[in-house]
Amino acid sequence: MISLMEARNLRKERTGVVLSNKMEKTITVAAKFKEKHPIYGKFVSKTKKYHAHDEKNECNVGDTVRIMETRPLSKTKRWRLVEIIERAK
């Protein structure tokens, strides 16, 4: 059986760029990843958008951030801000 601390460390993490911070305590993060095409075998770049919880409203558009999966916080929010890796210039 997995202990509570081990389960917390198994949560998914993503790194991405903040696209929007216009909502109260919420940011929109675009995470890029590469996926292999099932037929042709070529690696294709894809982007997925996540809504993440930003408790202190500290992110700005263009910041590079790390987000972590969490319990559902609203209809669309299932991620929370862990840290700001790099500020936008």
From Swiss-Prot:
SUPFAM superfamilies: Nucleic acid-binding proteins. Transmembrane segments: none annotated. Keywords: Ribonucleoprotein, Ribosomal protein, RNA-binding, rRNA-binding. Coiled coil: none annotated. Gene3D superfamilies: Nucleic acid-binding proteins. GO terms for biological process: translation. InterPro entries: NA-bd_OB-fold, Ribosomal_uS17, Ribosomal_uS17_bact/chlr, Ribosomal_uS17_CS. The keyword DNA-binding does not apply. One of its GO terms (molecular function) is structural constituent of ribosome. It comes from the Bacteria. One of its GO terms (cellular component) is cytosolic small ribosomal subunit. Belongs to the universal ribosomal protein uS17 family. HAMAP family: Ribosomal_uS17_B (MF_01345_B). NCBIfam families: PRK05610.1, uS17_bact. Part of the 30S ribosomal subunit. PANTHER family: 40S RIBOSOMAL PROTEIN S11 FAMILY MEMBER, SMALL RIBOSOMAL SUBUNIT PROTEIN US17M. One of the primary rRNA binding proteins, it binds specifically to the 5'-end of 16S ribosomal RNA. This is Small ribosomal subunit protein uS17.
